[in-house]
UniProtKB/Swiss-Prot annotation:
PANTHER family: BARRIER TO AUTOINTEGRATION FACTOR 2, BARRIER-TO-AUTOINTEGRATION FACTOR. It comes from Mus musculus (Mouse). Homodimer. Heterodimerizes with BANF2. Interacts with ANKLE2/LEM4, leading to decreased phosphorylation by VRK1 and promoting dephosphorylation by protein phosphatase 2A (PP2A). Binds non-specifically to double-stranded DNA, and is found as a hexamer or dodecamer upon DNA binding. Binds to LEM domain-containing nuclear proteins such as LEMD3/MAN1, TMPO/LAP2 and EMD (emerin). Interacts with ANKLE1 (via LEM domain); the interaction may favor BANF1 dimerization. Interacts with CRX and LMNA (lamin-A). Binds linker histone H1.1 and core histones H3. Interacts with LEMD2 (via LEM domain). One of its GO terms (molecular function) is double-stranded DNA binding. Its main location: nucleus. Keywords: Acetylation, Chromosome, Cytoplasm, DNA-binding, Nucleus, Phosphoprotein. The modification Phosphoserine is found at residue 4. Pfam families: SAM_BAF (PF02961). This is Barrier-to-autointegration factor. One of its GO terms (cellular component) is chromatin. The modification Phosphothreonine is found at residues 2-3.
Length: 89
């Protein structure tokens, strides 16, 4: 599977205070929905990812329920966070 430039940029460095929209799979619409629910930074979404024990099915279902992410968006976001964790945790 090839990854987007957005994905590669995200996993290339520590997360810091990056906005939630910097995550692969999260565009303007999903970013706004997540922000409205308190997930304004990428690290807040990472926290949920970790609470769900990095489980792909649970995380993707949570993302769908929380902001309406489709299958590709949730898969891209999951892959981005998984790869970031592999590199930095």
């Amino acid at each position: 599977m090839t990854t987007s430039q957005k994905h590669r940029d995200f996993v290339a460095e520590p997360m810091g205070e990056k906005p939630v929209g910097s995550l692969a799979g999260i565009g303007d619409v999903l970013s706004k929905r997540l922000e409205e629910r308190g997930f304004d930074k990428a690290y807040v979404v990472l926290g949920q990812f970790l609470v769900l024990k990095k489980d792909e099915d649970l995380f993707r279902e949570w993302l769908k329920d929380t902001c309406g992410a489709n299958a590709k968006q949730s898969r891209d976001c999951f892959g981005c966070l998984r790869e970031w964790c592999d590199a930095f945790l």
